[in-house]
Amino acid sequence: MLGAMAEEAVAPVAVPTTQEQPTSQPAAAQVTTVTSPSVTATAAAATAAVASPQANGNAASPVAPASSTSRPAEELTCMWQGCSEKLPTPESLYEHVCERHVGRKSTNNLNLTCQWGSCRTTTVKRDHITSHIRVHVPLKPHKCDFCGKAFKRPQDLKKHVKTHADDSVLVRSPEPGSRNPDMMFGGNGKGYAAAHYFEPALNPVPSQGYAHGPPQYYQAHHAPQPSNPSYGNVYYALNTGPEPHQASYESKKRGYDALNEFFGDLKRRQFDPNSYAAVGQRLLSLQNLSLPVLTAAPLPEYQAMPAPVAVASGPYGGGPHPAPAYHLPPMSNVRTKNDLINIDQFLQQMQDTIYENDDNVAAAGVAQPGAHYIHNGISYRTTHSPPTQLPSAHATTQTTAGPIISNTSAHSPSSSTPALTPPSSAQSYTSGRSPISLPSAHRVSPPHESGSSMYPRLPSATDGMTSGYTAASSAAPPSTLGGIFDNDERRRYTGGTLQRARPASRAASESMDLSSDDKESGERTPKQISASLIDPALHSGSPGEDDVTRTAKAATEVAERSDVQSEWVEKVRLIEYLRNYIANRLERGEFSDDSEQEQDQEQEQDQEQEQDQEQGQDRVSRSPVSKADVDMEGVERDSLPRSPRTVPIKTDGESAEDSVMYPTLRGLDEDGDSKMPS
């Protein structure tokens, strides 16, 4: 039995050593001649030790040539003008270009013009040219922690990271197939720190919110944080549709970008803030958008996400999870304090343009013809925000300080009763017959009428008789009634006409009917009834073309006036919202320093240069040759005609030697001091 084991031990050793017959045969002979079991085992071990290096050598011998014959790394060629040096890595190529070709100011060899290939970009600083060289060199040292994408410059990575703010579907979930074993089996793991772009301070998850139970498939653990851990079960955000008081992220982003562009136009003065038409056209682009300034949140840049749902199977359940918030990038046009102050001044000009222009206010349907619009805290409101129903903040055009019509004097306190409308404007507002001069016009009616009367009390024709109305004015009441549809719209009354039905039109000349008055003639003659005697609502016949045209025109005017008024209100409210947004940012100190803005401007300048380089544009700064320089070429080689000198006029104080009648001529061999004798 021991002999069989020895043979089995020797047999596998003899297989790989078949190539070397002289060495293997004596060893096998020695093993077969020994009869002791211990000696046999010792010989088998020695044979295996001797054969193992040979086997390893035979196995490694074909691998060594393969490694020696592998292709070398691809070399990178420097494409700088006049240089063709090859370098092994992008890092070495970048260092070569920066040190050899760009140089430094301290070594007196600084070159600020890129000569890579056909690029001739010129910068003003060495940092700019070194950052520009990264465009040509395939060096991408800056990697994104979220997706692993590499970038050449840090500003490119910074802009790329902002795009991950859109990833609001998956909150903190691992990728498929990369599940953490510590989360599966409840070990003391190190925690799954998934990369995220969320503000940790805005989403504190209390530690007592988790009710841990017996470990099941998903073991709740804590991330390695000093305090207040915010990682619990693996949970996903379920998109249950838009919430009632919250718009979607896409609409918020569109409004955010539109508002940033609007602030940029204000800074660059691309429209006149003193023009009502220009202001209205520019504000129209911001309407019907979900602007961050219209929300009641303290920080408009933050928008909450749907509440996450924990994925766990066990008798325990997670506590209430506050919804994390994603952070929109800051507005590039309102970063510094000076930007906020300047934009607030521009908005103030726009607000004054809308309020203080009489024509614009009258076109909006707020002012009446013949009245002057006064904007102050008495007739309007303390703030610039108009209420739902615009008050009549108008004063008379007389030179003295006339009283201001109160809002309650033009509207009935009850919305279910007809409102009082002013009488015809045929009466002069400056006369004593104006309803403004009545003491009843200045009384403020209480919100609820006291008494057992079911209907509101209306002023009679005798009210205020002793305070300005004469006996002749008793025939006409000082006020008329209007429907509830005319709540806030000012009626336009024509002067000197009565509001009555239009009389029926008749021919200019009518001949006398001389026919016999018999039965047949009576049947042939149609009976004409005056249209003014028939109620239009009870008129059975079809209206005439003039009536239809006039009615349609009046309806169109009312609709247009209503649209203009609503647009004016929207503009006023929007400007106030924008001013409140700027004021809140100034109060909270939400602005950056000027140094950060300068750095961002340099980065934007580098990005523009990179885009120009990719498009193949030649940005060499060349001084333009003017037409005058072209015309002056070759003038030095040509002889110019000498202009004759002006003969000076001899005065009384001049001597004969000073005055010369002829111009001075100089010879070739004279020094120019001698003069011709006169």
Curated annotation (Swiss-Prot):
Chain positions of all zinc fingers (C2H2-type): 76-101, 112-136, 142-164
Induction: By alkaline conditions.
Any single GO BP term: positive regulation of transcription by RNA polymerase II
PTM field: Activated by C-terminal proteolytic cleavage. At neutral to alkaline ambient pH, the signaling protease (probably palB) cleaves pacC within the conserved 24-residue signaling protease box, removing the C-terminal interacting region C and producing a 53 kDa 'open' conformation intermediate protein, which is committed to further processing. In an ambient pH-independent reaction, the processing protease (probably the proteasome) removes additional C-terminal residues to yield the 27 kDa functional form.
Gene Ontology MF terms: DNA binding; zinc ion binding
Annotated region (Signaling protease cleavage), positions in chain: 493-500
InterPro entries: pacC/RIM101 (IPR050806), Znf_C2H2_sf (IPR036236), Znf_C2H2_type (IPR013087)
Consequence of changing Y662N: Abolishes interaction with palA. Partially reduces proteolytic processing of the full-length translation product by signaling protease, causing a weak loss-of-function phenotype
UniProt-annotated stretches for the region Signaling protease box: 479-502
Positions of the UniProt region annotated as Disordered: 1-31, 51-70, 377-565, 590-678
Family: Belongs to the pacC/RIM101 family.
Function of the molecule: Transcription factor that mediates regulation of both acid- and alkaline-expressed genes in response to ambient pH. At alkaline ambient pH, activates transcription of alkaline-expressed genes (including pacC itself) and represses transcription of acid-expressed genes. Specifically recognizes and binds the consensus sequence 5'-GCCARG-3'. Required for virulence in invasive pulmonary aspergillosis (IPA).
Protein name: pH-response transcription factor pacC/RIM101
Gene from which the chain derives: pacC
